Amino acid sequence: MSNNSERSQGKCPVMHGGTTSGEQANMAWWPKSLNLDMAALKQDVTALMTDSQDWWPADWGHYGALMIRMAWHSAGTYRIADGRGGGSTGNQRFAPLNSWPDNANLDKARRLLWPIKKKYGNKISWADLIILAGTVAYESMGLKTFGFAFGREDIWHPEKDIYWGAEKEWLAPSSKPGGRYSGERDLDNPLAAVMMGLIYVNPEGVDGNPDPLKTAKDMRVTFARMAMDDEETVALTAGGHTVGKCHGNGDARLLGPEPEGAAVEDQGLGWLNKTQRGIGRNAVTSGIEGAWTTHPTRWDNGYFYLLFNYEWELKKSPAGAWQWEPVNIREEDKPVDVEDPAIRHNPIMTDADMALKFDPEYRKIAERFRADPAAFSDAFARAWFKLTHRDLGPKTRYVGPYVPAEDLIWQDPVPAGRTDYDVAAVKASIAASGLSISDMVSTAWDSARTFRGSDLRGGANGARIRLAPQNEWEGNEPARLARVLKVLEPIAAASQISVADVIVLAGNLGVELAARAAGVEVTVPFSPGRGDASQARTDVASFDVLEPLADGYRNWLKKDYAVTAEELMLDRTQLMGLTAHEMTVLVGGMRVLGTNHGGTRHGVFTEREGALTNDYFVNLTDMANTWHPSGDRLYEVRDRKSGKVKWTATRIDLVFGSNSVLRAYAEVYAQDDNKEKFVCDFISAWNKVMNADRFDLMS
């Protein structure tokens, strides 16, 4: 057997096989299995841009701006705080996003794409097609884009895990009780948009009241929560408004309901005007009416030319929305009508556009872009790529011939690690190091638990637990972490392998030793090949948001929160991609291994700490015990007859006995005939956590 990967000959399903980077992936055996002609696909999408349909005619004969808005609004729901939202799942097809006011008429964009999706079928996801359409739209209008990666996977129902806000109505003002703001306009975490139903800021101004400087403050918060800095904010705002127009040449009161509320005969289309003509020049979407630039189907620097060459005044659109229009503009600088080139109209700016002119920091950047069109094009192309790929995960997940070669810091780059080394020899060195089971398991867990299935960031690969900011996180117990790393790093150096591999291998060894102490001989699967990230290629501010505020698996809360400890555990469980039964078995195992944060004894329902037994579940479900509050969210476990305190516990521990679903799992693991199943299931879930970010093994 190759020593590149370890396997057990036991009865556990997880012990047989296990992919390693040294084995052939499916693509090596069947390299043509993807079978998507990407060049032909791009040609079809490009042709779509100028193939205007009578049922929803293209502005100026070009659908580019509509496709860009669709892609922008798909990707723009991403928020860095929890990694949720974004364009990697095609969630714009479902409620609530398909019916948000800010997404009005994007249902038409997706219907225009349907013939292409129908043609290519399963070879491309809706998520990929939506983002590709926006990127190709820019290319068709003259922008040299930075690149594009396939690899997004569709979901097939509305997402239930995303908190979009507490409001009960669309576009509720921030002054209304129960909203998303508190204090001095402090936006609730993890939200990024300023209103329910918007992607980012209100284009008319804060709560619909024009004031560019106030809007600039909203923009800075919103874009920062989308992982964008000031330069990227200016580039995206200006680049997004270089092409296309707003639609408000009509009466918004005549629009029908959104797609989710539309009549069955409307077949999923919303905002239909069944009273008057509501297409072309008469379409109503945001209520603002007009184009930003003189040539709305051409990539150029016209946005900055108009913004800075003219004074602007507030006016109302035909639909009654606030917008800015130029004073004394030359006729030749006006964009032509979307249907009749003999007619010209005033261009417009939103309050967000005017923020680029009035906010001092934004203006500096905008003036630089105005003077250097090439710099603007490059900055926008990079920002657009980041916007549309931020939630796609590391570069190893990118698919296709248009992937840019350059590694970008926001991709959290990790170099490839070695796979050709003697795993058993390294494990022997770790075993001789004197580290405890608790130290080995806790360190590996802390390294891996940062993984988020939402945007596929974090995880053990890269061993960023040894770098800032993670090496100072309270949840990682910095003093203990430093002591453990002082032992493991020399082992990695002596073996010329990554610290990341050694950390995980040490955790696996700890689990094996604990299983042996419980009377079960197993070998935890291990796949070498992790690399070590560098501090220089780690964006500290970007990683700050991955800091755990609580970890139910290690029975720890950083401080008191409005939500319960068990709710925080469920949120982390969902982000890590774990199921209810995996959560259950991991908590029970981690407790008996003595991995509680700070060495607390809460929930350690065993007299055999360090042995991977099912004692936690046996004692949790034992009716000889009673449970009593003891203050500060803690509980005592007492003998029912004597009243003697046997253990202490937290709400996290009690929920596995009180919740009917979790108790059902707990009872399974408490059974006398499931002691080995408990070990096997723990190892399976453990292995899933340790390899959650090993996308190189999933190709």
Curated annotation (Swiss-Prot):
There is a cross-link at W72-Y200 (Tryptophyl-tyrosyl-methioninium (Trp-Tyr) (with M-226)). Gene3D superfamilies: 1.10.520.10, Peroxidase, domain 2. The keyword Iron applies. InterPro entries: Catalase_peroxidase, Haem_peroxidase, Haem_peroxidase_sf, Peroxidases_AS. There is a cross-link at Y200-M226 (Tryptophyl-tyrosyl-methioninium (Tyr-Met) (with W-72)). Its cofactor is heme b. Signal peptide: none annotated. One of its GO terms (biological process) is cellular response to hydrogen peroxide. Binds 1 heme b (iron(II)-protoporphyrin IX) group per dimer. CDD domains: catalase_peroxidase_1, catalase_peroxidase_2. GO terms for cellular component: cytosol. Formation of the three residue Trp-Tyr-Met cross-link is important for the catalase, but not the peroxidase activity of the enzyme. Keywords: Heme, Hydrogen peroxide, Iron, Metal-binding, Oxidoreductase, Peroxidase. Heme b binds at H241. GO terms for molecular function: catalase activity; heme binding; metal ion binding. The active site is at H73. It catalyses: H2O2 + AH2 = A + 2 H2O; 2 H2O2 = O2 + 2 H2O. Transmembrane segments: none annotated. The record marks R69 as: Transition state stabilizer. Its EC number is 1.11.1.21. Homodimer or homotetramer. Belongs to the peroxidase family. Peroxidase/catalase subfamily. Bifunctional enzyme with both catalase and broad-spectrum peroxidase activity. This is Catalase-peroxidase. It comes from Aeromonas salmonicida (strain A449).
